[in-house]
Amino acid sequence: MHNIFKGLITALITPFKDNKLDLYALERIVKHQIKHEVDAVLIAGSTGESSSLSFEEYKLLLQTSVEIVNKCIPIISGCSSNNTTYARALAAESTKIGVDGFMASPPSYVKPTQHGIYKHFEALHEACNLPIMLYSAPTRSGVDFSDETILRLSKLPRIVALKDCGVDLERPLRIRATVKKDFNILTGNDEVVLAFNAQGGVGWTSVASNIVPNICKELLEKWNKNDTKGALEIHQKLLPLYTALFVESNPIPIKYAAYYLGLCENEIRPPLTEARDSAKKQIENIITSLSIKI
C-alpha cells in the first residue's frame, strides 16, 4: 500500500459565510494548495472546525473538495469523534465519497483506557478500506496513545501513520525502533518540524501552509536534499508566523490571516470567536514583514 501520509500536508481551514459553507472560498483555498504542489490536503480536521460541522455539511465539504482536487493531490478527511458509532459513519462516508485516507484522534472528553482507544480504532479500521493516520493531540483529546497502543494499532494493516502534536521529540525514534512496517510519523506542530524530522519524522501537517504553502514546501525540499542550512534559514524566517498563528486557539488566527489575504470571510463558529484586535495586528504585521501574497 502506497503511504500517502508524508511530506507537506496542509490542515485546511473551512470557510463559512452567513453560517453556511462558503464553497466559492473553498475552491480558492484548495486551488491555492494545488498551485503550490503540497503533498496532500487534510479536510475537516481541528483546523477545519470539524466539531462544528453537521453530518450533511461534512459530506458536502468532502464532496466539493474531491471535485475541486480532481485527483491532483491526495485528500485526507478528519474522522474524529468521541462517539465510536459516529466516527465509523464519518469513515464510511469518507470512503463512499472517494477521499484517499483519513485521520482520527482518540475520543475526547470520555477519557477511554488504552484498550478503549484500541477498540475505537479497530472499529474504524473495520468500517472502511482506506489508509488511516492516527492523530495524537493530547491537549485536545485529554488522552493520548501510549507507545504500546501505537505498536498494537500498527499491526492493523491499514493503520500506517501517526500525526503527533505532542512535544515528545524522542517519540519518533521509539516508534521507528518498534514498528516493523512502512509506518510514517509526522508532526502537527509547525515550529518543531525540523527537530521532529531529524528524529525520524517524514513531514508535517501544517497550519501555516494555508497561507504560505510555497515557503513550507521549499523548507521541506531543502531539508530532504540535506540542505540543513537553507532549511534552517527558512524555518527561522517563519518562526514569527508560527507564533502569531497560535497567539489564540487554532484556527482563530489562521482564519483571520486567510481573510486578510482575501481567501475567505473571517467567520468562525462558536464557541470560538474571531481574533482580538491585538492578535489581528500581530498577524497583519508578520504578513507584511514576510511580504505574503496569495
Swiss-Prot record:
Gene Ontology MF term list: (R,S)-4-hydroxy-2-oxoglutarate aldolase activity; 4-hydroxy-tetrahydrodipicolinate synthase activity
Q: What is its EC number?
A: 4.3.3.7
InterPro entries, A to Z: Aldolase_TIM, DapA, DapA-like, Schiff_base-form_aldolases_AS, Schiff_base-form_aldolases_CS
Keywords from UniProt, A to Z, are:
Amino-acid biosynthesis, Cytoplasm, Diaminopimelate biosynthesis, Lyase, Lysine biosynthesis, Schiff base
Where does it localize?
Answer: Cytoplasm
A Pfam family found in this protein is: DHDPS
Q: Where is this site: Part of a proton relay during catalysis?
A: 46, 109
Coiled coil start-end: none
Q: Name one GO cellular component term.
A: cytoplasm
Reaction catalyzed: L-aspartate 4-semialdehyde + pyruvate = (2S,4S)-4-hydroxy-2,3,4,5-tetrahydrodipicolinate + H2O + H(+)
Its pathway is: Amino-acid biosynthesis; L-lysine biosynthesis via DAP pathway; (S)-tetrahydrodipicolinate from L-aspartate: step 3/4
GO biological-process terms attached to the record: diaminopimelate biosynthetic process; glyoxylate catabolic process; lysine biosynthetic process via diaminopimelate
- Residues in the active site? 135, 163
Q: What class of enzyme is it?
A: lyase
Q: Report the domain of life of the source organism.
A: Bacteria
Family the UniProt entry places it in: Belongs to the DapA family.
Q: How does it assemble?
A: Homotetramer; dimer of dimers.
> Could you tell me what this protein does?
Catalyzes the condensation of (S)-aspartate-beta-semialdehyde [(S)-ASA] and pyruvate to 4-hydroxy-tetrahydrodipicolinate (HTPA).
Q: What is this protein called?
A: 4-hydroxy-tetrahydrodipicolinate synthase
Name the encoding gene, please.
dapA
